[in-house]
């Protein structure tokens, strides 16, 4: 793991002792989550902008932003404690490429359009697509970090799913919605 990701992990574990941001209690529990956040870089199309919905403790957005400093990231996180943590990360790590917005997806009214929309453990895929597709460029993609429950959330093609261990990465183009 690169030094910046190690710094992120260390800070998250420190904050986690008092703020309960993640289920991970030590580095051996957190490292697989960071690896999981970065795995899609092996198959996603290159992107210059990303909207992460429900950023929480920063997974997957912070590892992605650290690995892709040339891309711009908007992190939507409505909870005060988690948004404060994300702002702290921005102040101590080289994360000039992120903007933290303390709002729920449904309340976010910006007109921006991004190349990629990500989400991990937030809501059903159908809900996320319905509420966020207006923020996605016509040639953009959704990337949702899911598990086996995906089959109960939305109809999908097998070509829209990539698997790694127990994770299902749902990767769908906006064009395929039509």
UniProtKB/Swiss-Prot annotation:
UniProt: S-adenosyl-L-methionine binding residues: 54, 59, 105-106, 120
What is catalyzed by this enzyme?
A: guanosine(527) in 16S rRNA + S-adenosyl-L-methionine = N(7)-methylguanosine(527) in 16S rRNA + S-adenosyl-L-homocysteine
Intracellular or extracellular location(s): Cytoplasm
Specify whether Cell membrane is a keyword of the entry.
no
First-listed, main subcellular location of the protein, grouped into a coarse class:
cytoplasm
What EC number(s) are associated with this protein in UniProt?
Answer: 2.1.1.170
Q: Which InterPro entries match?
A: rRNA_ssu_MeTfrase_G, SAM-dependent_MTases_sf
Identify which top EC class this enzyme belongs to.
transferase
Asked if the keyword Glycosyltransferase belongs to this entry, the reply reads: no
Q: Which NCBIfam families match?
A: rsmG_gidB
Q: Which family does it belong to?
A: Belongs to the methyltransferase superfamily. RNA methyltransferase RsmG family.
- Can you name this protein? Ribosomal RNA small subunit methyltransferase G
Q: What is the lineage of its organism?
A: Bacteria, Pseudomonadati, Campylobacterota, Epsilonproteobacteria, Campylobacterales
The UniProt gene name for this protein comes to rsmG
């Amino acid at each position: 793991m690169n030094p910046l990701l190690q710094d992120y992990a260390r800070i998250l574990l420190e904050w986690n002792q008092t703020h309960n941001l993640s289920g991970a209690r030590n580095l051996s529990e957190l490292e697989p989550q960071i690896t999981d956040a970065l795995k899609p870089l092996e198959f996603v199309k290159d992107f210059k902008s990303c909207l992460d919905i429900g950023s929480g403790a920063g997974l997957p957005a912070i590892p992605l932003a650290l690995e892709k400093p040339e891309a711009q990231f908007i992190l939507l996180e409505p909870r005060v404690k988690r948004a404060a943590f994300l702002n702290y990360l921005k102040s101590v790590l080289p994360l000039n490429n992120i903007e933290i917005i303390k709002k729920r997806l449904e309340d976010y009214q910006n007109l921006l359009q991004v190349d990629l929309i990500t989400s991990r453990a937030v809501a059903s895929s159908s809900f996320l697509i319905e509420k966020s597709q207006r923020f996605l460029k016509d040639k953009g993609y959704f990337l949702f970090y899911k598990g086996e429950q995906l089959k109960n959330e939305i109809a999908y093609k097998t070509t829209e799913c990539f698997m790694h261990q127990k994770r299902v990465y749902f990767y769908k183009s906006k064009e395929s919605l039509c």
